[in-house]
Curated annotation (Swiss-Prot):
InterPro entries: EF-hand-dom_pair, EF_Hand_1_Ca_BS, EF_hand_dom, Recoverin
Name of the featured protein: Hippocalcin-like protein 1
Matches recorded under Pfam families: EF-hand_7
Miscellaneous remark of the record: Probably binds two or three calcium ions.
Covalent lipidation (N-myristoyl glycine), chain numbering: G2
Listed PANTHER family: CALCIUM BINDING PROTEINS (PTHR23055), HIPPOCALCIN-LIKE PROTEIN 1 (PTHR23055:SF79)
Residues where Ca(2+) 3 binds: D157, N159, D161, K163, E168
GO biological process: regulation of signal transduction
EF-hand domain span: 41-58, 60-95, 96-131, 144-179
Similarity comment: Belongs to the recoverin family.
SMART domains, sorted: EFh (SM00054)
Parts forming coiled coils: none
């Protein structure tokens, strides 16, 4: 009796179909898996960090996972429900480049003011380095988080105001594929750094 139904209700399925790039069958399969891993229907930051650590066994992914979690948790209640999870997964795995860049921008914009400051960029880049630097050799001009942040700002901050707008971020990323790799937050693509 206390067991949650492992099928999505028709109205929820329709909402997710309209807001993701997944088929009905895929949505039902993801939902079953989500409930198996999160029987409460909600994922906490600690649970999320444990899952994320599996993708990066040789580094410390906890800080980066916190930033990803915050970006997934669109209603700010401190948990990720299935809707938040599947919409973010759709954007990051099947979204168009512009959607992915907007999502990444929202992750880097820590205070939500619509701009990425040098400090915000540095915090995320430091988290990435903690996660992957033990298994990756960085080029000399990106050998520290500070150098990588400087490189990103040099290329993207076109008006030199010390912060990146969404427009600068998207334009800069689109004009330089290596920047897309620098900003990449998809665990399966870290080898492309």
């Amino acid at each position: 009796m206390g067991k949650q139904n492992s099928k999505l209700r028709p109205e929820i399925l329709q909402d997710l179909r309209e807001n993701t790039e997944f088929t009905d069958h895929e949505l039902q399969e993801w939902y079953k898996g989500f409930l198996k891993d999160c029987p409460t229907g909600h994922l906490t930051v600690e649970e999320f960090k444990k899952i994320y650590a599996n993708f990066f066994p040789y580094g410390d992914a906890s800080k980066f996972a916190e930033h990803v979690f915050r970006t997934f948790d669109t209603n700010g209640d401190g948990t990720i429900d299935f809707r938040e999870f599947i919409i973010a997964l759709s954007v990051t795995s099947r979204g168009k480049l512009e959607q992915k860049l907007k999502w990444a921008f929202s992750m880097y914009d820590l205070d939500g003011n619509g701009y990425i400051s040098r400090g915000e960029m540095l915090e995320i880049v430091q988290a990435i380095y903690k996660m992957v630097s033990s298994v990756m050799k960085m080029p000399e001009d990106e050998s520290t988080p500070e150098k990588r942040t400087d490189k990103i700002f040099k290329q993207m901050d076109t008006n030199n105001d010390g912060k990146l707008s969404l427009e600068e971020f998207i334009k800069g990323a689109k004009s330089d594929p290596s920047i897309v790799r620098l900003l990449q937050c998809d665990p399966s693509s870290t080898s492309q750094f």
